[in-house]
């Protein structure tokens, strides 16, 4: 799997957020977006995930089977600021829904609901309503969604928000394991993720004049 972004630009309303962003990630590679609030990190992730149309530029997910490209929804998980879980449903019901809805992409096997919750350090709570969990526990379960339906590309927006130091390390290990299996990770964060080998793209937002366009 390869992820290629070429000369991306994006707007929020009338404001130009960033211009000329390009990068390429191959299997086993990670890119971490850093920068101040408002610099465009979340916007770039949403563009790559296919949730926001770019002002210009292209995003291509391609592999040997589909050299012409595949849709972001087929090959990527997007974990945003919101956990995308129903408070009134149990942990198991939420994860079962996502497992059935997303299906499985690629040759790697997805985890069962019980194994996924165990992987994020929360075994034995699948019977509890999601709304009963603490903010940190809810974030862990949201991350477990990535494990119950395989996608080669993980797009993560502040994945360790609301987590303590021990959970940070656990998540870093899960991300490393995904990379070792040939996965790709694109993440935005204010805190170091603790990945051993990752590239960094510092987002500065759009300031000044470029080719006559005022940001």
Swiss-Prot record:
It is a peripheral membrane protein. GO terms for molecular function: ABC-type heme transporter activity; ATP binding; ATP hydrolysis activity. It catalyses: heme b(in) + ATP + H2O = heme b(out) + ADP + phosphate + H(+). Pfam families: ABC_tran. Its EC number is 7.6.2.5. One of its GO terms (biological process) is cytochrome complex assembly. ATP binds at residues 35-42. SMART domains: AAA (SM00382). The keyword ATP-binding applies. It is found in: Cell inner membrane. The complex is composed of two ATP-binding proteins (CcmA) and two transmembrane proteins (CcmB). Part of the ABC transporter complex CcmAB involved in the biogenesis of c-type cytochromes; once thought to export heme, this seems not to be the case, but its exact role is uncertain. Responsible for energy coupling to the transport system. Belongs to the ABC transporter superfamily. CcmA exporter (TC 3.A.1.107) family. This is Cytochrome c biogenesis ATP-binding export protein CcmA. The gene is ccmA.
